[in-house]
Amino acid sequence: MPARASRPAPGLPARAGLGFKPEHYATLVEQPPDLGFFEIHAENYMVPGGPAHAQLAWLRERYAISVHGVGLSLGGHDPLDARLLAGHRQLQRRYAPDSISEHLAWSRHDGRYFNDLLPIVYDDAALRRVCAHIDQFQQCLGQPILLENPATYVRFEASHIDEAQFLCELVARTGCGLLLDVNNVYVSAVNHGFDARAYLARLPLAAVGEIHLAGHARQRDAHGRAVLIDSHDAPVDEAVWDLYEYTLALTGPVATLLERDGNIPPLAGLLAETGRVTACLARGLALAA
C-alpha cells in the first residue's frame, strides 16, 4: 500500500456531512442531527433573500458549511460567467463557508449553457485553460478552492495526459485542493477499465480537503456493455464503500459528504448512511494514531 498522505489543511471538520435538502428542513429544526457539516449548491442561493437564505442562515449558525458550485464551467473555452463569479463572492461574504468547490468539467460553450457536467480533453491547452480559470476563481474569492474529479463515460483520442496526472498538475500550478469523489473514481474505473486503487495512489492526496460518496446506476450502452452512471439516486454501493475505506487508509480522516439528489428518502434514511461514514472515519482515525 502507498504511504499515507499528510493531512489536508484545516477547513471542514473530518466528520460526516450531508447535502442540504429543503424538504428535510422541518425535521432538522425539530431534531438537529450530530453531523459535521452540510453542503449546498451555490447556484440555488444566488438570490438576495427568501426562504432559502433563511434556512441556510439557520444551518450556518449550527454547522460547518461547504459551498459546491456546478455551473462555472472551469473546463470550458468560454470566459467564466461574471455573474456567477459575483454570486460566489456574495455567498462567501455572507456566510464565510468552510469550503468552496467546483468541478473539472465544462457546461458552457459559445454563450450557451448545458445542464450537465461534460468531460474535457486532457491536453496541454486544456491544462493551461483550466489553470487560468481556477486562478481567476481563486483570485475572486481570495482563497483556494477544491476541485472535484469527474465521473466520465467517454475518453478522447486527443487526450495525451492521464487524468490523475492532470489533477496533479492543476494542484501544483494553482494551489487548489481536491474534492475527491470516490464514487466518481469507481464509476470511471468500471467504465474505462482501469484500476481505481492505482488511480488513487497517483493523486496528490495531501491536497484532499473533502470526500464525496454517492450512489450510481447501472445501464447498458448501444452495444450491450455495462455502463455506470453517477446518478446520486441510490444508496452508496458496497464496492464504493470498500474503495472509501481504502482511500481513508491513504488520506487519514477527511470530511466526507453523503450525496443524494434523486429518490430522496426521509432524513432518517440518510442519517443511517452517514452513521456508516462516521464508523469508517473512526477506523481511519485509529489507523492514523
Swiss-Prot record:
Which family does the record assign?
Belongs to the UPF0276 family.
The record's InterPro entries line, in alphabetical order, gives: MbnB/TglH/ChrH, Xyl_isomerase-like_sf
User: Which HAMAP family does the protein's record reference?
Assistant: UPF0276
One Pfam family name is MbnB_TglH_ChrH
Spans through the membrane: none
User: What start-end ranges are recorded for coiled-coil regions in this protein?
Assistant: none
Q: What protein name is recorded for this chain?
A: UPF0276 protein BP2925
